[in-house]
């Protein structure tokens, strides 16, 4: 399990995270939302062991995180982060070598590396461009390479920072499909994003942060339907939730579900 217990973190004398109690093992996809400066990025760095809290703990497998070199190495094989900018974690000019980089550092046999790289590229739908030079890839393709680089570690938790930032509508739809495939393999995904519609559609649970504290958390439909909480957090409601709260239309999880239900209603009225 990956969780936090009364987690506090400050930069110099300025508290950034204030007593966070969170459990990311309870839901396949957990969304983190909040205005700029609410602590999302700092939380990610604490979860991955890049930062160490001054009080409280990150809990891994039910125990406080071990910050020794061996402990952090073990954590990062199970909890992998994919940054908003894929350029921050792509080091090679060819895709296969870049994805295999961490496995070779760990001494994984070449046959196993080949198998894992091939599986990861298939999962992120990158087989058709795997032989292109990385510098020729689009931003969205580089994001998929970065995700594949995390997947080859067979991590059980994937931390995605703004996975749809900079993507066109087709790329955004493809990213949602990739996340669903990752979860279908039994993994957990934690998403930090300003794309409120993405978080609503794909998350099973949501934490809303405000000034380093948990303002509210729960099921996406319940959390985002609370207009007062959204305003307090400096957020807007997902458009599907707005249709429900402001117009009284049925609360739907996806655009496809919404239009399907509207078409059924129109058909009934016409008949």
UniProtKB/Swiss-Prot annotation:
Pathway: Cofactor biosynthesis; adenosylcobalamin biosynthesis. The keyword Transport applies. It comes from the Bacteria. It is an enzyme of class 7 (translocase). ATP binds at residues 34-41. It is found in: Cell inner membrane. Keywords: ATP-binding, Cell inner membrane, Cell membrane, Cobalamin biosynthesis, Cobalt, Cobalt transport, Ion transport, Membrane, Nucleotide-binding, Translocase, Transport. GO terms for cellular component: ATP-binding cassette (ABC) transporter complex. GO terms for molecular function: ATP binding; ATP hydrolysis activity; ATPase-coupled transmembrane transporter activity. The keyword Translocase applies. Its EC number is 7.-.-.-. SMART domains: AAA. It is a peripheral membrane protein. One of its GO terms (biological process) is cobalt ion transport. NCBIfam families: cbiO, PRK13638.1. Part of the energy-coupling factor (ECF) transporter complex CbiMNOQ involved in cobalt import. The complex confers cobalt uptake upon expression in E.coli; can also transport nickel with a very low affinity. Presumably responsible for energy coupling to the transport system. Belongs to the ABC transporter superfamily. Cobalt importer (TC 3.A.1.18.1) family. Forms an energy-coupling factor (ECF) transporter complex composed of an ATP-binding protein (A component, CbiO), a transmembrane protein (T component, CbiQ) and 2 possible substrate-capture proteins (S components, CbiM and CbiN) of unknown stoichimetry. Expression of just CbiMN in E.coli confers some cobalt uptake. This is Cobalt import ATP-binding protein CbiO. It comes from Salmonella typhimurium (strain LT2 / SGSC1412 / ATCC 700720). The gene is cbiO.
